[in-house]
């Protein structure tokens, strides 16, 4: 059964925003309580967060569909809906997030680094928030916005300081098992290692990690063997260690040709030219292996490599190797810029989102694109005439109608707001200039303009009293 997965496709859905509430305050002896509809809650985000305790993407291989909770709708009495709960998905350190086209969206390195893969929708405003001096009792509320839907790919690139590379059965797993406490599978046949193994090595005051990469063969960079699947795990390593088999039984192979083949594959893969290299001649406990190591060592040193003769089985030469690796790792760490865990947002919001465009398409349709118009359309309940009128007023104030006229739109032309796959299309009817004033104030409650009964009765009594007083003052006795 598969226990290690380093590449998955993930389908994430953020929560939808809750709808706003349209309600009027009702209380005894308060006939004009006014609007008191609360706002809807925000939908939950889907967040990828690096967790050091997670080492594989196996969970997302089995269940690739993940969804955050929706925001709750607002209620009367100025009660706002509850926000949806964010869905936090733990991922291994070194996870790369890509879109469907293969573009890198985020590179998550460092414990706690987070990435918002899908943003929750905003909650709709209740009618209490929409009330104004001109619109005193709105009979509508705004709808909550839908959450983001994203299809993303996750790739794990192991975060290690040292990578052991070499032919299958060169002794890489044996070497990492004696340098660290790792317990990889070890056997005397090729491709025993099917997944990268990580081990932690302590050399003096330096602690570093070593990755045992599955064996490489000629053509690995083009997908032969297992190389293409796991070469990306070498990308983050600071030091490359060539593990060469000095006791191979294959007559056409020798340490120098093995080194040339592996270097060719690394060069074809790309991006690894500046990594420092160390050559390890393994299996010197075998008599023929010791002799071969002494023969090829001068040639390797002439090429500029630091060479170490070791035996993972007999534990020979390991201390010198571990301290040499620690020195190179410390140098690489000192030269590396400090990385801080940051919360990455998939689409940063612009400070000014008031811009929009109007284009005329070949079929005569006018298309409006812009953050505000598209958001307003998503928030509108088209079953409510008052809400549609409110949308018309907002678009008019933004200048959409002016641009439509300049683009050549006429009464009855088709207008679409939004992208082709999710647009609202309607027949355009130009509004009257200052339409809100000419057509009446939408959402106005005329009871606010009428005199209140108690005040009217008080005025009537005062008028009767004044009239009686005047009659009394003008009374002349016989």
From Swiss-Prot:
It is found in: Cytoplasm; Cell membrane. Changing residue 168 to V: Overexpression suppresses sporulation more than the wild-type gene. Gene3D superfamilies: GTP-binding protein OBG, C-terminal domain (3.30.300.350), GTP1/OBG domain (2.70.210.12), P-loop containing nucleotide triphosphate hydrolases (3.40.50.300). PANTHER family: DEVELOPMENTALLY REGULATED GTP-BINDING PROTEIN-RELATED, MITOCHONDRIAL RIBOSOME-ASSOCIATED GTPASE 2. Residues 469-478 have a biased composition (Acidic residues). Disruption phenotype: Essential for growth, it cannot be disrupted. The lineage of its organism: Bacteria, Bacillati, Actinomycetota, Actinomycetes, Kitasatosporales. GTP binds at residues 166-173, 191-195, 212-215, 282-285, 311-313. Transmembrane segments: none annotated. PROSITE patterns: G_OBG, GTP1_OBG, OBG, OCT. Residues 160-330 form the OBG-type G domain. Changing residue 172 to N: No phenotype upon overexpression. Residues 348-430 form the OCT domain. GO terms for cellular component: cytoplasm; plasma membrane. This is GTPase Obg. Induction: Expressed during vegetative growth it disappears during stationary phase and sporulation (at protein level). One of its GO terms (molecular function) is GTPase activity. Belongs to the TRAFAC class OBG-HflX-like GTPase superfamily. OBG GTPase family. Residues 60-88, 438-478 are annotated as: Disordered. Its main location: cytoplasm. HAMAP family: GTPase_Obg. It comes from the Bacteria. Its EC number is 3.6.5.-. Monomer. The gene is obg.
């Amino acid at each position: 059964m598969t226990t290690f997965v380093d590449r998955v496709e993930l389908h994430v859905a953020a929560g939808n925003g809750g709808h706003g509430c349209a309600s009027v305050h009702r209380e005894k002896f308060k006939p004009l309580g006014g609007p008191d509809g609360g706002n809807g809650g925000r939908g939950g985000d889907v967040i990828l967060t690096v967790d050091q305790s997670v080492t594989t993407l196996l969970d997302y291989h089995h269940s690739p569909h993940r969804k955050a909770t929706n925001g709750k709708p607002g209620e009367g009495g100025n009660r706002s809906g509850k926000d949806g709960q964010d869905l936090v998905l733990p991922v291994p350190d070194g996870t790369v997030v890509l879109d469907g086209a293969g573009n890198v969206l985020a590179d998550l390195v460092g414990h706690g680094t987070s990435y918002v893969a899908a943003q929750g929708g905003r909650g709709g405003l209740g009618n209490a928030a929409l009330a104004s001096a001109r619109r005193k009792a709105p009979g509508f509320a705004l709808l909550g916005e839908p959450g983001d839907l994203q299809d993303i790919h996750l790739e794990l690139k192991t975060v290690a300081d040292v990578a052991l590379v070499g032919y299958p059965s060169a002794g890489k797993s044996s070497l990492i098992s004696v340098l660290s406490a790792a317990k990889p599978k070890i056997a005397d046949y090729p491709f025993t290692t099917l997944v990268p193994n990580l081990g932690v090595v302590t050399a003096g005051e330096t602690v570093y990690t070593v990755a045992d990469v599955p064996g490489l063969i000629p053509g690995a960079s083009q997908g032969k063997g297992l190389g293409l699947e796991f070469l990306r795990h070498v990308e983050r390593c600071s030091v490359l260690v060539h593990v060469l088999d000095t006791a191979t039984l294959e007559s056409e192979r020798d340490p120098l040709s093995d080194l040339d083949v592996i270097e060719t594959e690394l060069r074809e893969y790309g991006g690894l030219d500046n990594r420092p290299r160390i050559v390890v001649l393994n299996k010197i406990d075998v008599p023929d292996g010791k002799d071969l190591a002494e023969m090829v060592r001068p040639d390797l040193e002439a090429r500029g490599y630091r060479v170490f003769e070791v035996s993972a089985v007999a534990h020979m030469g390991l201390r010198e190797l571990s301290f040499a690796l620690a020195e190179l790792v410390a140098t690489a760490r000192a030269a590396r810029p400090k990385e801080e865990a940051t919360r990455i947002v998939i689409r940063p919001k612009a400070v000014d989102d008031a811009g929009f465009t109007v284009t005329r398409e070949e079929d005569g349709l006018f298309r409006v694109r812009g953050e505000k118009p598209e958001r307003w359309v998503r928030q509108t309940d088209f079953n409510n005439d008052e809400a549609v009128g409110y949308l018309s007023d907002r678009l008019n104030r933004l200048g959409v109608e002016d641009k439509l006229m300049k683009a050549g739109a006429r009464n009855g032309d088709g207008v679409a707001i939004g992208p082709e796959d999710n647009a609202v299309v309607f027949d355009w009817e130009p509004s009257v200039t200052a339409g809100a004033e000419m057509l009446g104030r939408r959402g106005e409650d005329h009871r606010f303009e009428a005199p209140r009964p108690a005040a009217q009765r008080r005025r009537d009594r005062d008028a009767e009293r004044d009239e009686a007083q005047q009659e009394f003052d003008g009374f002349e006795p016989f």
